[in-house]
Amino acid sequence: MKIVVIGGTGLIGSKVVSRLRDQEHEMVAASPATGVDTVTGQGLAEALAGARVVVDVSNAPDWGDTAVMDFFQTSARNILAAETAAGIGHHVALSVVGTERLQGSGYFRAKLAQEEAIKAAYVPSTILRATQFFEFIGRIADSSTHDGTVRLPPLFFQPQAADDVAAALADIAEGAPVNGTVELAGPERFRLDELVRRYLRASKDPRHVVTDARAPYYGLEINDERALLPGDHPRIGATRFADWLSRTTAKQTTP
């Protein structure tokens, strides 16, 4: 089966391509680097010709409020139109757990607009909402650092490994569309500030983490400490944080 992964050269997309190729599917990794631009529509028709499934894990290059909304709305419109023309039978999209609760952020407003466009289209679809990735914990620390101190709120947090997200997307791509939303989370629940503290300590990063209930998460002050958690019955990834952290720090210290 021919499957197109839009954003197929990035962290998640490249893993999805690899997993599905191992299952002997014909894979196309579509991205600006391979001549496919979802904003202009360039290369979409050619990439989708003969495909049965499209997996969209693309992300906006600019997270400014206007730019990110333009990216997700325009890309969704172009991708879905190209899929309709190509007769695609299953559109799989990656989104974020808690999107509807984080509408104070321009990024999450744009992700919700993307989801709404998918649901309104005629292409059968599955939206996978995932919690944050372990791989981005360092970025969270960086975005919350001022004068060498990391200030973070004690939000509940159920992150997961990128490998588990890719595995779920690959599994969904091989299955029937649910025409709805599926949630995916890690196997453990933490407080955000404590998890970042553990990550920095293991990475031998000297930054001090201060717990501050009013500190923003990616620029957004969140009053609901459960806003980043999935609902009652998510799919659960296999990788525990300690195991991922051990492997990651071992790679960092290997000459």
Feature locations, PLM:
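Non-catalytic, hydrophobic alpha-helical segments
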Residues: 12, 54, 165-169, 184, ...
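NAD(P)H-binding glycine-rich loop region in Rossmannoid oxidoreductase-like domains
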Residues: 22-86, 97-106
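Glycine/proline-rich active-site loop of Rossmann-fold NAD(P)-dependent oxidoreductases
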Residues: 135-141, 145-147, 172-182, 205-207
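Mobile cap/lid helix-loop segments that border enzyme active or cofactor-binding sites
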Residues: 189, 196-255
